[in-house]
């Protein structure tokens, strides 16, 4: 059997998976290109808004905090909310996976809205816990920020997508 015949047979057998991967790659590239191009219009204002929201929540629970631009200060400890701190790229990745999967546009829209909400809520919790950790145990901040929360957040993204797929395509 010739190699090209085997490849063609494999492609026919795996058509849906190949289609998903191709669409996922395309949608991911488009999402990241749009976010990169809209840096000053979307990303920077989102960072400022997250800093302000963080300040407001901390003040509600009686913690003296302040924010300026994308920086949140809390009792001598400050962090700057930057591109990878705002969940927008993770939401872009999740959205690309949802829209690449074969489902109705209503299922995709609902999955996008609910999933994005979950991811932004988890990210907000991430920001609050990292601020608290930085204030109480500054030496642990870098490891928690760069390793622990990055891994946890990617697991949350994957879990959200798997939960959505399981909801629209229950396993028999």
Show where each model-derived region lies.
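Hydrophobic N-terminal alpha-helices or hydrophobic patches in metabolic proteins across all domains
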Residues: 1-172
